């Protein structure tokens, strides 16, 4: 018992020290992945393009220009301060970032893939890239664009071709109809005019001929009838007697 009482103060002191230093330990472990002391903005040409749409996911290929002095590339994709998507390859997690330690470089560019659900609005995702050189990092941001499938990409062209064909056909039909209508109207007008003129001429000629013929026939008939009556009158016996009587009376009066 005396020995236990002697150890209790030391045990309590150890527990207090452990509680006091535990936050610093966790902070040290949490921040141990930070490989840089200073950060500078950069305009490095970072390329992030959607290369493949598989099922319900879209895979983006991220290309980062590097050289022999680059020791690590840190990538972070966040939306509303929360990590989005998954990264490929061998990396270490650091908070909401992934760290790619570059030990050997075979080319002047570092590539990795980032996969995200196709339903995710990538235009609202902040993709940040850190390039670490001698504990100094340059930071760049990339604007992501949604992947357009080939069917969607080819739709405007087919619609344009269909619309162009439809418009051309409609214009051709309209022109043909207009020309045909004008031609029909012209032909109808010409035919109507010709028929009307011909009919009018024929009617006028017929009427004139009929009237002239009727008048001529009537006058000729009347004249012939009058002459015939006169001849008949003169040639009758009564007319002869009257003629003789008239000659006798005239001779008496004269002589």
Curated annotation (Swiss-Prot):
Signal peptide interval: 1-26
Propeptide: 237-255
Main localization (coarse): membrane
Protein origin, superkingdom: Eukaryota
Entry-listed glycosylation sites: 57, 67, 126
Subcellular location: Apical cell membrane
UniProt PTM: N-glycosylated.
Record keywords: Cell membrane, Differentiation, Glycoprotein, GPI-anchor, Lipoprotein, Membrane, Signal
Membrane topology recorded in Swiss-Prot or TrEMBL: Lipid-anchor; GPI-anchor
Gene Ontology BP, a term: cell differentiation
Claim: Iron is one of the keywords in the record: no
Protein name stated in the entry: Placenta-expressed transcript 1 protein
Gene this protein is translated from: Plet1
